[in-house]
């Protein structure tokens, strides 16, 4: 029998100490990684619940194990809320991650060797959209589209590639693109060549849920997303679709038993919580502020002489090119890290440097907006970053900025009382 008095702090002091240090880092550092956010205590409570003890292979009402009557309720709540949130007829909440959701879509609708047309990783796409190092680029014949000199997707070029290569699936989605996608145009191109349209909205799902970014569900054959990032839930995946019994059956079979075994019901419970949070009126205000904050930061960088890819942003992120300044993304990332500002180095279009070094930074505002930052704080923050980038190697500038970061973090705690 377990004793509730045997806490983690008492049983495993080393692990607990590391966790406490990470909690302190999150409070004391400004988080600008576009794919990161902070979950609510309710999400974490669900994820740390007794649901972690239950095996539940199958789907609600059709399990391979007994004793699933309550996890069925949990999973059905998540399904129903996801469908309501995104206006979908179908939802599968079992994928353990966004990459696994994408793999399940490919498994459901493609055969090995089929052609897919997706956005190039070097131009802002994702590994799972056909990058050569990913299974999506190894199992399928991946053709890639990119962005033009203005940093925008050239839809005529996408159409030309689709007509030339006749893909079975067109993938729309990104990990580093700051403008809105034209889902109607993608649908038109897909229909012209008889391809499935698959949208990966992992980065913008929260914006979509709040109605501040176009919803791909009415246009796509299938949509995937992560449940963290802008959606602010647990780390996990989600598949959505319009009503199509044939596709629904294929997707369910591809997730289980095709790609996964037992679902993580404690994570699914946390997804249900985050979907309920996203259905609240204040979530829309939060997402609107996320975009305003990103736009405010981008404006400051442009005013200070830095190049923002595509000239600005219509979502939660933007790419900062440092080619003109001859600064590597790796060095900029490290310098900002010493000031307790966390970003990630990122390749920019036509980057002359390797992906391990890069010539740019990806900056996103979901996490700082969760803390309570508004446009004023974000403009000030962008100015601090510019000060460091304009004085690379000057540790006194980094020290001064770190002091300002500590003060603003104390003013805007992640988890208040």
Swiss-Prot record:
Which reaction(s) does the protein catalyse, per the Swiss-Prot or TrEMBL entry?
(6R)-5,10-methylene-5,6,7,8-tetrahydrofolate + glycine + H2O = (6S)-5,6,7,8-tetrahydrofolate + L-serine
Q: Which GO terms describe its molecular function?
A: glycine hydroxymethyltransferase activity; pyridoxal phosphate binding
Residues recorded with modification N6-(pyridoxal phosphate)lysine:
229
One of the GO BP terms on file: tetrahydrofolate interconversion
Query: Site (Plays an important role in substrate specificity): which residue positions?
Result: 228
Entry GO terms, CC: cytosol
**Per the database entry, which stretches of residues form a coiled coil?**
none
Q: Which cofactor does it need?
A: pyridoxal 5'-phosphate
Q: Which InterPro entries match?
A: PyrdxlP-dep_Trfase, PyrdxlP-dep_Trfase_major, PyrdxlP-dep_Trfase_small, Ser_HO-MeTrfase, Ser_HO-MeTrfase-like, Ser_HO-MeTrfase_PLP_BS, SHMT-like_dom
Primary location recorded for the protein, binned into one broad class: cytoplasm
Enzyme Commission number, as recorded? 2.1.2.1
Query: Which Gene3D superfamilies would you find in this protein's record?
Result: Aspartate Aminotransferase, domain 1, Type I PLP-dependent aspartate aminotransferase-like (Major domain)
**What UniProt keywords apply to this chain's record, in alphabetical order?**
Amino-acid biosynthesis, Cytoplasm, One-carbon metabolism, Pyridoxal phosphate, Transferase
Compartment(s) where it occurs, according to its Swiss-Prot or TrEMBL record: Cytoplasm
Could you tell me which pathway this protein works in? One-carbon metabolism; tetrahydrofolate interconversion; Amino-acid biosynthesis; glycine biosynthesis; glycine from L-serine: step 1/1
Outline what the protein does: Catalyzes the reversible interconversion of serine and glycine with tetrahydrofolate (THF) serving as the one-carbon carrier. This reaction serves as the major source of one-carbon groups required for the biosynthesis of purines, thymidylate, methionine, and other important biomolecules. Also exhibits THF-independent aldolase activity toward beta-hydroxyamino acids, producing glycine and aldehydes, via a retro-aldol mechanism.
**Which family is this sequence assigned to?**
Belongs to the SHMT family.
Quaternary form? Homodimer.
Tell me the protein's name. Answer: Serine hydroxymethyltransferase
Q: Name its species.
A: Stutzerimonas stutzeri (strain A1501) (Pseudomonas stutzeri)
């Amino acid at each position: 029998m377990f004793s509730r008095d045997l806490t983690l702090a008492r049983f495993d002091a080393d692990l607990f100490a590391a966790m406490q240090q990470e909690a302190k880092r999150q409070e004391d550092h400004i988080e600008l990684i576009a794919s990161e956010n902070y979950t609510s205590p309710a999400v974490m409570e669900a994820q740390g619940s007794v649901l972690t003890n239950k095996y539940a292979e199958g789907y609600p009402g059709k399990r391979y194990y007994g004793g699933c009557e309550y996890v069925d309720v949990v999973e059905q709540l998540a399904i129903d809320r996801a469908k309501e949130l995104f206006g979908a007829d179908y939802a599968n909440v079992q994928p353990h991650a966004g990459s696994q959701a994408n793999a399940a879509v490919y498994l459901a609708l493609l055969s090995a060797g089929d052609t897919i047309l997706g956005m190039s990783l070097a131009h802002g796409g994702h590994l799972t959209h056909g990058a050569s190092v990913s299974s999506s680029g190894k199992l399928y014949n991946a053709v890639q589209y990119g962005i033009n000199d203005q940093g925008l997707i050239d839809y005529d070029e996408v159409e030309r590639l689709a007509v030339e290569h006749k893909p079975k699936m067109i993938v729309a989605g990104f990990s580093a693109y700051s403008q809105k996608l034209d889902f109607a145009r993608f649908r038109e191109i897909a229909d012209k060549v008889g391809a499935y349209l698959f949208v990966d909205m992992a980065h913008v799902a929260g914006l979509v849920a709040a109605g501040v970014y176009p919803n791909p569900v009415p246009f796509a054959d299938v949509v995937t997303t992560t449940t963290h990032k802008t959606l602010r839930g647990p780390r996990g995946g989600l598949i959505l679709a319009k009503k199509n019994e044939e596709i629904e059956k294929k997707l369910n079979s591809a997730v289980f038993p095709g790609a996964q075994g037992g679902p993580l019901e404690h994570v699914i419970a946390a997804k249900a919580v985050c979907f309920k949070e996203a259905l609240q009126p204040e979530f829309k205000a939060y997402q609107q502020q996320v975009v305003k904050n990103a736009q405010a930061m981008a404006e400051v960088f442009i005013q200070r002489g830095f190049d923002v890819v595509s000239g600005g942003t219509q979502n939660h992120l933007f790419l900062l090119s440092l080619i003109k300044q001859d600064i590597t993304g790796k060095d900029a990332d490290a310098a900002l890290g010493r000031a307790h500002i966390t970003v990630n180095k990122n390749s920019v279009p036509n980057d002359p440097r390797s992906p391990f070094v890069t010539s740019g930074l990806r900056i996103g505002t979901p996490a700082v907006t969760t803390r309570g930052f508004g446009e004023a704080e974000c403009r000030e923050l962008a100015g601090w970053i510019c000060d460091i980038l304009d004085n690379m190697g000057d540790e006194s500038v980094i020290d001064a900025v770190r002091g300002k970061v500590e003060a603003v973090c104390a003013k805007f705690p992640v988890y208040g009382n």
